[in-house]
Amino acid sequence: MSNDEIVAGIMRDYILNLLKEKKRIDDRGFEDYRPIEVEVGVIEKAEGSALVKLGNTQVLVGIKATLGEPFPDTPNMGVMTTNVELVPLASPTFEPGPPDERAIELARVIDRGIRESRALNLEKMVIAPGKIVRVVFIDVHVLDHDGNLMDAIGIGAIAALLNARVPKVLYNEETGEVEILEEKEPLPVEKIPISVTFAKIGNYLVVDPTLEEEQIMDGRLTITTDETGHISAVQKSEGGAFKLEEVMYAVETAFKKAEEIRKIILNALEKANNSEE
């Protein structure tokens, strides 16, 4: 057995003993998030942006929007692409190069939560059907990894989309000419999907796992919900099995915690709007 395995075993026993006493390694309750800080409009050259701090986990999200062609199978819909970059400075386990499995999973789950909830109305991003649409890029940079990247990125992505302002566009059907105006407008964001992540450690479920908890967890479950009462994404990873009653508890808790996080995002947006006036 390697030294790393011995240390992991000791840490697992320590965390499990705390959980048996209804405690966590950082004194939070099982359903408590670490402090969440959201600041929008932090990247001047981006259409929208957000800096999110979830405890010591920190992510930066930028929104870029251009005009382009729609996909052939969806001529009446705009395009949205999500990319996650795990900056090597954020964690010793992150390496430079193309996105690894972790980055791909993070991008897919966040993208799915936004897409399936129809939070960003892609149909309203069409300039000329089948010809010209808005193309929106959600670019995520992980600056510091101390656990639960999924929720931090999810918060940052929707906050940045809500913060985004894009130039208005006029299309002349007769000439096919496009005029990009100086006047700006928000993206058609109509819902605020929020992901809530649970770590299963032994027989216990805890919200917003720290890096130490993630390193010894038996499984992870992320549930994305919107304010209309719908679930738009579910992701189980890191092995492990979840009982039906555990999933039902997680769903109920996800709706409750998402409402709290939604208020934090809206407060950050209101604060930014007030500072501009």
UniProtKB/Swiss-Prot annotation:
> Which UniProt key words apply to this protein?
Cytoplasm, Exosome
InterPro entries recorded: ExoRNase_PH_dom1 (IPR001247), ExoRNase_PH_dom2 (IPR015847), ExoRNase_PH_dom2_sf (IPR036345), Exosome_comp_Rrp42_subfam (IPR050590), PNPase/RNase_PH_dom_sf (IPR027408), Ribosomal_Su5_D2-typ_SF (IPR020568), Rrp42_archaea (IPR020869)
Q: Which domain of life is it from?
A: Archaea
Write out the GO cellular component annotations.
cytoplasmic exosome (RNase complex)
The record's Gene Ontology biological-process terms are: rRNA catabolic process
Q: Keyword Cytoplasm: yes or no?
A: yes
Stored SUPFAM superfamilies: Ribonuclease PH domain 2-like (SSF55666), Ribosomal protein S5 domain 2-like (SSF54211)
Where is the protein localized?
A: Cytoplasm
Q: Which Pfam families match?
A: RNase_PH, RNase_PH_C
Question: Which GO terms of the molecular function aspect are on file?
Answer: mRNA 3'-UTR AU-rich region binding
Q: Which PANTHER family does this chain map to?
A: EXOSOME COMPLEX COMPONENT RRP42, EXOSOME COMPLEX EXONUCLEASE RIBOSOMAL RNA PROCESSING PROTEIN
Complexes and interactors: Component of the archaeal exosome complex. Forms a hexameric ring-like arrangement composed of 3 Rrp41-Rrp42 heterodimers. The hexameric ring associates with a trimer of Rrp4 and/or Csl4 subunits.
Q: Which purpose does this protein serve, as stated in its record?
A: Non-catalytic component of the exosome, which is a complex involved in RNA degradation. Contributes to the structuring of the Rrp41 active site.
Q: Which family does it belong to?
A: Belongs to the RNase PH family. Rrp42 subfamily.
This chain belongs to which protein, by name? Exosome complex component Rrp42
